[in-house]
Amino acid sequence: MDQCGTVERELEKVLHKFGGYGQHCERSLEELMEYAGGLRREILQAAEQDGELSGTLSLVLTQCCKRIKDTVQKLASDHKDIHSSVSRVGKAIDKNFDADISSVGIDGCWQNDSQQILSEVMVEHFFRQGMLDVAEELCQEAGLSIDASQKEPFVELNRILEALKVRVLRPALEWAVSNREMLMAQNSSLEFKLHRLYFISLLMGGTVNQREALQYAKNFQPFAENHQKDIQVLMGSLVYLRQGIENSPYVHLLDANQWADICDIFTRDACALLGLSVESPLSVSFSAGCVALPALINIKAVIEQRQCTGVWNQKDELPIEVDLGKKCWYHSIFACPILRQQTTDNNPPMKLVCGHIISRDALNKMFNGSKLKCPYCPMEQSPGDAKQIFF
């Protein structure tokens, strides 16, 4: 993050210079045009009177040409100075970021099945972004066969999201009503918040929409139990329709941020109904990589300097723990207390009859014949009675 801050500071300097140069350039050119325009009018007047330029006017014309030349040279010089500032941004990027990241890669990681999985993840990401043409082109180039049923939900969701971004609620309301039972099963407040926004949009129309707003308030009835206070606030705002909601204690109802919030809520709840994560796997992987890559490059350099290349064999493990933040916590992680190793798909956690948990590798190493003694209590049991645990 320090490297990003350094580059950002250089970039801010350049942008500041761009803004200042643009204003100075525009101001200088306007002054020149005004000065040259005035001189032109004087020349035309002199031509109408005697047809010849006076000595004074000729001198002024010479000075005007010199002023134009000096101004252009000054602007060109300032422009060169900006170029040097731009080059400093490039140097800051080269200095603070490692252009070669191949040292932390795994040979052959994108071959065969892995390449196909990556292509499928990219296709799903493009579907989520509404870039259907790009996704279909990638399917053809990668030789993927994507069923139309996989694409249709994303088409509908993107259509609704685009409507919400321009503050059109009808498509989202229709979707929420048709999926009401499933939304209520997951305790979603999406439909209520959509009705709330529509009601607020009616309030913004003033007294003209008062009757329609009262009629529309009937849609709040199914949500009265869980959103009673919010509904009371909405109904109380009707008292101030005549003077305008923006001039009332209910002005917070007009907060523009709630439109961005409703887009996030819709995306989250719609993805939950489809059994999808809110963010695409590609976005999550990219974000995690941006956090982990600097740490891995640094530890790789230390390992090479100390000639300890055997410490990191790059086989589905890292030499250090990389904290990706709570945003990337998707499930619990179990470390076997016997072997002091983190469990994996090939070495999952196993629950013994007594309730204690160890890894499968530890289980295989500890049983003697047909019996296994728990390392934490005196209970003896059969290894076959152990059950795999899923976090």
UniProtKB/Swiss-Prot annotation:
Keywords: Cytoplasm, Metal-binding, Nucleus, Transferase, Ubl conjugation pathway, Zinc, Zinc-finger. A zinc finger (RING-Gid-type) spans 336-377. The keyword Cell inner membrane does not apply. It catalyses: S-ubiquitinyl-[E2 ubiquitin-conjugating enzyme]-L-cysteine + [acceptor protein]-L-lysine = [E2 ubiquitin-conjugating enzyme]-L-cysteine + N(6)-ubiquitinyl-[acceptor protein]-L-lysine. It is found in: Nucleus, Nucleoplasm; Cytoplasm. Its EC number is 2.3.2.27. SMART domains: CRA (SM00757), CTLH (SM00668), LisH (SM00667). It comes from the Eukaryota. One of its GO terms (biological process) is protein polyubiquitination. Residues 153-210 form the CTLH domain. GO terms for cellular component: cytoplasm; nucleoplasm; nucleus; ubiquitin ligase complex. Coiled coil: none annotated. GO terms for molecular function: ubiquitin protein ligase activity; ubiquitin-protein transferase activity; zinc ion binding. Its main location: nucleus. Residues 114-146 form the LisH domain. The keyword Protein transport does not apply. Identified in the CTLH complex that contains at least RANBP9, MKLN1, MAEA, RMND5A, GID8 and ARMC8. E3 ubiquitin-protein ligase component of the CTLH complex. This is E3 ubiquitin-protein ligase RMND5A. The lineage of its organism: Eukaryota, Metazoa, Chordata, Craniata, Vertebrata. The gene is rmnd5a.
